[in-house]
Every structure is written in C-alpha cells, then in structure tokens.
Amino acid sequence: MSGNTLGTLFCVTNFGESHGPAIGCVIDGCPPGMELSEADIQADLDRRRPGTSRHVTQRNEPDAVEILSGVYEGKTTGTPIALLIRNTDQRSKDYGNIAQSFRPGHADYAYWHKYGLRDPRGGGRSSARLTAPTVAAGAVAKKWLAEKYGTRFRACMTQLGELPIPFESWEHVPHNPFFAPVADVQAYEDYMDALRKSGDSCGARIRVQATGVPVGLGDPLYDKLDADIAHVMMGLNAVKGVEIGAGFASVAQRGTTHGDSLTPTGFASNNAGGVLGGISTGQDIEVSLAIKPTSSIISPRESIDIHGQSTEVITKGRHDPCVGIRAAPIAEALLALVIMDHALRHRAQCGDVVQAVAPIPAVRLG
C-alpha cells in the first residue's frame, strides 16, 4: 500500500491499523535544535482522543505518545522523529458479524477489491484511528511554525447535521464537546442524544484557520498552497468537500465583491482565504470541510457479502455518531503539516528574496 507519506521536505509517514498493537508516524525533515517533548505533542492528542464525551466513540484510548528517536537532551537532532501510540482498548470481537460483508458508505468494499483482502477490525487501515499520528506530527509542525513565524492554528464546528452553528467567539471552542464557537450547546447535545438513540449518524462542517502565515508559501503551477491544502484535507476520513476562502459562495459573487481590495493599511476582505495564485498572501488561511455521516451505524442496511449475495448489515461496536465532532484538531494538524512543508520549501528556494515594501497587514474577520 502506497500513499502513506505526505510532504516534500517535511515528510510524515503514517503506519499501523485500528486494532493492531500500535499506530504511529515517522517525521523526516524537522529542523534541528527545537525543544521537543512528549508533553508538547500530548496536548493536541488529548483534544482528539476518544471517550471524552457521550457524543463520541467510547473506545477508551489514552493515546499516550512516545518519542522513539530524533530528540536528544530535549532538542530535535534533524534526524527522523519516530512517534508511537500504543492501542490499548481494541475490541475486535465486535466486528465478527461483518467480516464477510461490506458496510454501505465504508471503505470495506473498495479495499477488498483493490487489495484482495481487508482487515475488518475497526476498519483496519481505513479507520479514523489513524488520525492520531497525524495529530502528533501536526503538533511538531505547529511548534516550529509558532516559534519561527508566530503562526497559530484553530478550528471549530460550524454545522452539525442540519443545525447551523453561528459564530460567536473562538473563546467558546475549548469549553464544549463539539468544538463549537458558541456559549450554549444544549441544542446540539439534545440533537446528538436523539440521533444516537435512533441508531443513525450525521455529518458536520468544520472551519479551519491559520493566522500569522508568512507571505510567499506555495509553488505554482502544480504545488500551489491551496491545491496541497485541498489534497491533504481530502485525505481526512469522511471529508467529501473542501472550500478555500469564500469557496462555492464565489459562484454567486461579483468580481467587485469577491476581489479583496488592497490598501496601505491592509486587505479589505478575505474572500481568497489567504491564497492568491497558489501563494500565501499573509492573510489568514481559511478552510472549510464538509464531513459525511459515519458509515458504521446500528441501523440495518442492505448490502452484499464477499460472494456477491444480498445481506443485511448491522454494525456493532463503538463508533462516533458524528466523526466531525473530533475533526477540529485533526484538520488543524493537516493544515499545519502543509504549511510547515511549504515553509521549508520556500526557505530553500526563496529564503534570500527581500522586498523593499513590507507585506500589508491581514484583515481580522473572526
């Protein structure tokens, strides 16, 4: 299986399966000399980990990260950084009834046809469990970017199923299980309680933002920053759509509205989402993700087995009724990995380029 490594200079290779002994990643290309400990990584893993509320899977994994290499006396050495997260709460017996059949909407069918076999335990390699190493690697990228450029990452949920979530303040996001930017989440609690009792699942919309991104990241024509962001975000489990800036709303805009006016004191708007011509402008990078409903649900559905015969599928086990609830820290990590890689690439080719006129300030839109 190829397709497990992302990045050109900051390369991350992800390994493991949902019910294997461990999952992890190897980071190659991290600059030397940065202070790094497990604690620097664990904070983001704790934001993503399962079992933190009744609205997510009750699989109780501590997701404790171990740094196996690439750090000496508390600093990165420039050699590959190996990160390991041990699986401790697998329950493979829950998947015995679907070992010979395919879950509608799941990767089961495609994996089986492509590779000739599949690991049904928790989805194997296709499981969202494999996003934990991504978050770990993203934490390393976040730390370097924060120290080098002051870049910061944050994400929130802007829609849960049919329910839009109005934006009030980023300050609310850490204080509720939905990563919602609102003070009162009772309506979303009630919605998820009813959904879980019905045996169904729902999708979500996630907003991801990077602030303090330097001007100049991205390599046209085919390695544009926004192209790489979209590419990597589509690799996140259950993502079915990616928008940069105004995204699909651009269709209904006029050029007089969509084009972000430039003034000596800053951009007047940010419909471009921080990227023009595939290159960062210094504006906030704005990304929106559409996440489909979870495919592993207890409601009976029609499918076929590995012999092509009709069957009924009921998925047991512990699953997220909405995978979007835990997607915010994962999306932050993926955005950080793309920006980190492009920052190193920009430094390698254009690090000596100096403009007499400083970049204009970014507009703050919330």
Swiss-Prot record:
Homotetramer. Belongs to the chorismate synthase family. The lineage of its organism: Bacteria, Pseudomonadati, Pseudomonadota, Betaproteobacteria, Burkholderiales. This reaction introduces a second double bond into the aromatic ring system. One of its GO terms (cellular component) is cytosol. It comes from Acidovorax sp. (strain JS42). The keyword Nucleotide-binding does not apply. InterPro entries: Chorismate_synth, Chorismate_synth_AroC_sf, Chorismate_synthase_CS. The gene is aroC. This is Chorismate synthase. GO terms for biological process: amino acid biosynthetic process; aromatic amino acid family biosynthetic process; chorismate biosynthetic process.
